[in-house]
């Protein structure tokens, strides 16, 4: 009783009692002491560190894109390469903006939507680039058609024992990647709509939350796309060997799928209580948003190393050496703006999707034809296999392939 009385009517001569009492009552529940670890995401240090890696990655990649557009000597190949390279600026800058505004549950979802849509675009372009390297569908089929599919548990072909490669196999690979280009944007739009109605929260696996169903659909779609890429690489790895496909394949796969599995790991950690929420008088952020903030910070750092690796994997120097044609003449070069415009034109993707998903699919492809009379210099052939395939695309005619079994 005396203690409570002293607290209500403090003695002016004892200031310690007066100062101690308000300090206890003024400390809100969920004070900064409860968020010592995650508060790093809100500091200037986190923004500066992530910003340094992001802007450095942007400079490296934008210079590489500029050089590809300047040496735009193989449009059919470089169109897909430039599209793939754009994943670094989009991923890096988008993640950095999400990190800057991660305390708002709305903003980071919208930023992530743009990033998610583009990653599906990259998978398709990587497969299309491999097609271009090998001269198109008909050139690939002339090499692998009728060959038995080797059974391998590593590449997931153990269930295909006894089957042979057919045009249906290539169609399946294209369809499996194209479906991801459709499913991913649809899931991104669904996420925005569910978020607006309060039915979506990162890391919430409750049956009433849209996060559970979006994650399941996305998992199925991305697994199918990845499986198709593995199958195609398994079938053509020897043909692709002159183009260093392992590094290219690893980089594209890691940039896209590593970020996904990082997000899944953070969601599991959040569910286990390893990621606390931020709850203070100034701001209140749920565990799912904090996990998304960590994901954005990690991506910002990773994009710097991705930019360095992609610079080596998709070097422009190969195309700078191809400015001279077989006759030693300077190949006509387009302006950088027109090359960029051609690169960003999605007409080829739309046409490919219509062709591969059309019920009237006739199993036709573009057959490349080589000009006769190869040039010999000093007793050695002057054109490599890659030059021959590239030059072959200059003269194309439509060839109707005979129908065979679907894959």
From Swiss-Prot:
GO cellular component, one term: membrane
Biased composition (Low complexity): 1-28
Entry's transmembrane regions: 40-60, 84-104, 121-141, 178-198, 214-234, 249-269, 290-310
Domain of life: Eukaryota
Cellular compartment(s): Membrane
Chief subcellular location: membrane
Renumbered residue ranges of the record's region Disordered: 1-31, 369-395
Membrane topology value: Multi-pass membrane protein
Keywords from the named record: Membrane, Phosphoprotein, Transmembrane, Transmembrane helix
Chain positions with Phosphoserine modification: 388, 402-403
Pfam families in the cross-refs: Solute_trans_a
Cysteines engaged in disulfide bonds, as pairs: none
Known role: May activate the MAP kinase signaling pathway.
Record-stated family: Belongs to the TMEM184 family.
Protein name: Transmembrane protein 184B
Lineage, opening ranks: Eukaryota, Metazoa, Chordata, Craniata, Vertebrata
């Amino acid at each position: 009783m005396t203690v409570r009385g002293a607290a209500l009517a403090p003695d002016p001569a004892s200031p310690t009692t007066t100062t101690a009492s308000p300090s206890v009552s003024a400390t809100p529940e969920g004070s900064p002491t409860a968020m010592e670890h995650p508060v790093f995401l809100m500091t200037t240090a986190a923004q500066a560190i992530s910003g340094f890696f992001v802007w450095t990655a942007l400079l490296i990649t934008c210079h590489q894109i500029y050089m590809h557009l300047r040496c735009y000597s193989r449009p059919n190949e470089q169109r897909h390469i430039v599209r793939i390279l754009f994943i670094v600026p989009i991923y890096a800058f988008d993640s950095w903006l999400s990190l800057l505004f991660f305390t708002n549950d709305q903003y980071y979802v919208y930023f992530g939507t743009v990033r998610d849509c583009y990653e599906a675009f990259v998978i398709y372009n990587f497969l299309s680039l491999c097609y271009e390297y090998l001269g198109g569908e008909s050139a690939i089929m002339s090499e692998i058609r009728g060959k038995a599919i080797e059974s391998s548990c590593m590449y997931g072909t153990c269930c295909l024992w006894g089957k042979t490669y057919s045009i249906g196999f290539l169609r399946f690979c294209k369809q499996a990647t194209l479906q991801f280009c459709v499913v991913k944007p649809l899931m991104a739009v669904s996420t925005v709509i569910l978020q607006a109605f309060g039915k979506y929260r990162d890391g919430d696996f409750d049956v009433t939350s849209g996060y559970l169903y979006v994650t399941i659909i996305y998992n199925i779609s991305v697994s199918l796309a990845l499986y198709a890429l593995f199958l195609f690489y398994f079938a053509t790895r020897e043909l692709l060997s002159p183009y260093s496909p392992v590094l290219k394949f690893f980089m594209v796969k890691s940039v896209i799928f590593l970020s996904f599995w990082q997000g899944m790991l953070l969601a599991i950690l959040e569910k286990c209580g390893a990621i606390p929420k931020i709850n203070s008088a100034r701001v209140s952020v749920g565990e799912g948003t904090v996990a998304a903030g960590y994901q954005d910070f990690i991506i910002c750092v990773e994009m710097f190393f991705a930019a360095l690796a992609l610079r080596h994997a998709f070097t422009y120097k190969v195309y700078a050496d191809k400015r001279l044609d077989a006759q030693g003449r300077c190949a006509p070069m387009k302006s950088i703006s027109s090359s960029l415009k051609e690169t960003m034109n999605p007409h080829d993707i739309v046409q490919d999707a219509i062709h591969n998903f059309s019920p009237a699919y006739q199993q036709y492809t573009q057959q490349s034809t080589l000009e006769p009379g190869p040039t010999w210099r000093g007793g050695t052939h002057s054109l490599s296999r890659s030059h021959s395939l590239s030059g072959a695309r200059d003269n194309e005619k439509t060839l109707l392939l005979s129908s065979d079994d679907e894959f």
